[in-house]
From Swiss-Prot:
Protein name as it appears in the record: Sperm-associated microtubule inner protein 4
Free-text tissue specificity from the UniProt record: Predominantly expressed in the testes.
Residues with Phosphotyrosine modification: Y442
CC terms in the record's Gene Ontology section: centrosome; cytoplasm; motile cilium
Coiled-coil regions, chain positions: none
Keyword terms: Cell projection, Cilium, Cytoplasm, Cytoskeleton, Flagellum, Isopeptide bond, Phosphoprotein, Ubl conjugation
Chain positions with Phosphoserine modification: S407, S422, S485, S547
Function (record text): Microtubule inner protein (MIP) part of the dynein-decorated doublet microtubules (DMTs) in flagellum axoneme. May serve to reinforce and thus stabilize the microtubule structure in the sperm flagella.
InterPro entries in the cross-refs: SPMIP4
Residues carrying Phosphothreonine: T219
C-alpha cells in the first residue's frame, strides 16, 4: 500500500523482514518446474525485490480504533478563527498500533450537550442500562417460538418431486376445504387422549373417531413456527434459544405471486402425474401396438363430459389418437366410382366364341360327329397299331376344307416344348378392381382351384395321318397346333425333350390331374398361394432342421478336443488369488 502523503508519522516502517528466511528460500532443487525465477531464489534476488518494491505498513491504529483521529468538536461559542488540527477523539492512548499517538497532551474535554443524549444524574457512569441488582425483571406468560424437536433429522427441501398443484380439483386446497373429503385427500389422524395414572403399568388411551363431516385434512406441522408455552413458577424454567429457522413442510399453498397458475395447468400436472403411473407393459402392449402419446391438455373435454355425466371421478388421461385400419383407396372399379360420385357400370359378361359355329352344347355338327375328341385321342394313342389307316383321303380333304372355313377364328399359338405355363391354358385370377371386399376375395381365392386342361383341346381337330406310338416316334409342335407330322431338319429337337413331352401327353387326364397334386416335381404354374387352402411345399431346410441333434453335436465337440480332460481336483498355485499372508499357496501345500 502506498504511503499517505502529508502523514509520515503514521507509517514509517516497511513491510517484510530485512533478512531472507530459510522458510521462503527456494531454488531449482526445490521447484524444478518453475519457469520464472522466484523473487526468493537467493539473498541477492530478495534484496533487489526489497529495493524495487517498497511496501509500507498499513495505517491501522488511531484512525481505525475506537474514537480515532477526528476533527475537534467545539460549540459555536468556542469556535476558533482557523480550523484546528485533528486530535484524538478520546483522551486515552491506544497501544499496539503502527503509528504514533497524536497529540501527547492533556485529555480532550467531552461535551455531552452537543448530542441528544443527556448525562444521567442517577448513575456514576454513562451507562443507560440499570444495574443488575437493582433491575426488576418480570415474567411474560406468552408462547415463544422454539425449534422442532426433530429439526436436525428433517430435510430442508423436498426429497421427492411433486406434481400436485394448489389449484388441483381433486388434491388441491379446494378439495381440502370441502366436506366430506374426496377419496384423493388424506385425512388427519384421530385425536387420542392418554389416561394413565403415575405408577400404573398399563396405558389407557381414548381415541375420538369423528364423523366424515368433522374430519380434518392432513397437514405437515411446523411450516409456520412451533410455539412453546412457559411453565409454572414451581416447575423448571425453559431455556431460551434464538429464533429457529423456518421449516420447509411439503404443504400446498396458494402462490399469489404466480398469476399463470390456473385450473387448466393443474389438470395438465395431474395428467402428467397419472402418466408416470403407467407400466411399460401397459404402454407397449395395447392390442393395437404401442400406446400413442397421451392427451395432457384435456381440461375442456373433461368439463363437458362432467356436465353431461359421461366420466367418473378423476379419469385417466386418454391417448391423442387410436390406430385404425384404413384400406387403400382404389383407383378404378365400383368403389372408386362411388367415391368420385360417378355412376356405377353394369357388369358385362364376356362370352368366348365357340371354335365351331355349327356346334351347339347338345348337338354337334356332321364334322365333329366322326372326329374324335382330345380325350379319345389320348386314350387311343397307346393302343393304335402301326401301319393301320384310320380314314381315307376324302376325309382328309374335308378336314382341310373345314380348316379353311374356320380360319377366321383365332386359334392358340405354338407352345414351347418345356414351358408348362403354355401347355396349361390357365387364367390365374381375373382382374380385381373392388379392393375393399378383402374378405370375399380371400374366400374366393381359397375356393379357387387350378384345373389342368389337356394339351389338345376337345374343340380342336387332329389329322389322322402318320399317327403312331408317341413313345417310339418323335413328334414336335409346328405352326399348326392340331396337326402332327414327322420331324424335319429345321424342327429337330433332342430325344429326351420329345420323349418327356410325348410321355406327358400320352397320360390320361385323370392321371395327369393326380400327378399335378401329388408329384413334387410337377408344381402348379402359379406356385403356392398363401391362405389358399393348399399346404406350402416343404423344402430342404426342414430336413436340415430335423437332422440336427444336440447330443450328437456335443459328442462331436468332445471328440474334436485332442487334449486330456482337465481334472478339477488338481491344485493350482499360480495367480494373484493364491497369495495368503504374503506367501503363495504353493508353500502351504508342499
Amino acid at each position: 500500500m502506498e504511503v499517505i502523503h502529508g502523514r509520515p508519522y503514521c507509517c514509517r516502517e516497511l513491510e517484510g523482514a530485512d533478512i531472507l528466511s530459510n522458510t521462503f528460500y527456494s531454488n531449482e532443487l526445490h521447484n524444478p518446474l518453475q519457469t520464472v525465477t522466484r523473487p526468493t531464489a537467493s539473498e541477492d534476488r530478495y534484496q533487489e525485490l526489497r529495493e524495487s518494491l517498497q511496501q509500507c505498513r498499513l495505517p491501522w491504529g488511531a484512525e481505525r480504533e475506537y474514537g480515532g483521529i477526528i476533527p475537534i468538536s467545539l460549540p459555536e461559542d468556542h469556535r476558533p478563527k482557523y480550523e484546528p488540527p485533528r486530535v484524538m477523539g478520546k483522551g486515552h492512548q491506544h497501544y499496539g498500533f503502527g503509528g504514533e499517538t497524536w497529540p501527547r497532551k492533556l485529555p480532550v474535554e467531552q461535551f455531552y450537550y452537543l448530542t441528544q443524549n443527556k448525562k444521567s444524574d442517577v448513575y456514576g457512569n454513562d451507562s443507560l442500562i440499570p444495574k443488575p441488582p437493582n433491575s426488576t425483571v418480570g415474567e411474560i406468560c406468552l408462547p415463544y417460538p422454539i425449534e422442532h424437536p426433530y429439526h436436525t433429522h428433517i430435510c430442508r427441501g423436498a426429497m421427492f418431486p411433486t406434481f400436485t398443484s394448489p389449484e388441483d380439483l381433486y388434491t388441491g386446497i379446494k378439495a381440502r376445504t370441502q366436506q366430506p373429503f374426496p377419496p384423493t385427500v388424506p385425512t388427519k389422524a384421530y385425536d387420542s387422549t392418554v389416561l394413565k395414572t403415575r405408577g400404573n403399568p398399563y396405558r389407557y388411551e381414548l381415541i375420538d373417531i369423528p364423523m366424515d363431516s368433522k374430519k380434518k385434512a392432513l397437514t405437515w406441522p411446523g411450516q409456520g413456527v412451533y410455539y412453546d408455552f412457559p411453565r409454572g413458577v414451581e416447575k423448571n424454567k425453559p431455556v431460551f434459544y434464538p429464533k429457529p429457522p423456518k421449516t420447509f413442510a411439503p404443504n400446498t399453498s396458494l402462490n399469489s405471486w404466480d398469476p399463470i397458475c390456473s385450473a387448466k395447468e393443474a389438470n395438465i400436472q395431474r395428467n402428467l402425474e397419472r402418466s408416470h403411473w403407467l407400466t411399460s407393459y401397459t404402454h407397449d402392449f395395447t392390442g393395437l401396438g404401442p400406446m400413442d402419446p397421451l392427451e395432457l391438455d384435456d381440461y375442456h373435454e373433461k368439463m363437458v363430459a362432467e356436465l353431461t355425466r359421461k366420466i367418473g371421478f378423476d379419469p385417466e388421461p386418454q391417448e391423442k389418437f387410436h390406430p385404425v385400419f384404413k384400406p387403400p383407396r382404389p383407383l378404378e372399379g365400383r368403389i372408386a366410382r362411388l367415391i368420385q360420385n360417378r355412376r356405377s357400370l353394369e357388369a358385362i359378361v364376356q362370352q368366348r366364341p365357340r371354335s365351331c359355329p355349327d356346334c351347339t352344347p347338345r348337338v354337334l355338327c356332321n364334322f365333329h360327329t366322326f372326329v374324335p375328341s382330345s380325350k379319345e385321342m389320348v386314350a387311343l394313342s397307346d393302343n393304335i397299331p402301326a401301319g393301320v389307316t384310320h380314314k381315307n383321303q376324302d376325309i382328309e380333304e374335308k378336314i382341310i376344307e373345314e380348316q379353311s372355313l374356320l380360319s377366321t377364328y383365332e386359334l392358340p399359338s405354338c407352345y414351347p416344348t418345356k414351358d408348362l405355363t403354355s401347355i396349361y391354358d390357365i387364367k390365374p385370377f381375373p382382374k380385381i378392381t373392388d379392393t375393399k371386399k378383402t374378405e370375399d376375395l380371400y374366400w374366393r381365392q381359397q375356393s379357387l382351384k387350378t384345373q389342368p386342361t389337356p394339351y389338345c383341346k376337345p374343340d380342336h381337330w387332329i389329322h389322322y395321318e402318320n399317327l403312331k406310338s408317341p413313345l417310339r416316334d418323335q413328334y414336335n409342335m409346328c405352326p399348326d397346333p392340331v396337326s402332327l407330322s414327322k420331324p424335319s431338319v429345321l424342327q429337330n429337337k433332342q430325344d429326351t425333350e420329345a420323349f418327356t413331352l410325348e410321355h406327358f401327353l400320352s397320360k390320361p387326364e385323370e392321371e395327369l390331374f393326380l400327378n399335378m397334386e401329388n408329384n413334387e416335381e410337377t408344381r402348379p404354374v402359379l406356385g403356392w398361394i398363401p391362405r389358399a387352402g393348399v399346404t406350402k411345399p416343404q423344402t430342404n431346410l426342414l430336413e436340415l432342421k430335423n437332422s440336427f441333434s444336440k447330443t450328437g453335436a456335443q459328442k462331436r465337440f468332445h471328440k474334436s478336443i485332442l487334449e486330456d480332460h482337465k481334472d478339477l481336483r488338481d491344485n493350482e498355485h499360480s495367480g494373484m488369488k493364491h497369495q495368503f499372508y504374503g506367501h503363495n499357496s504353493y508353500y502351504f501345500y508342499n
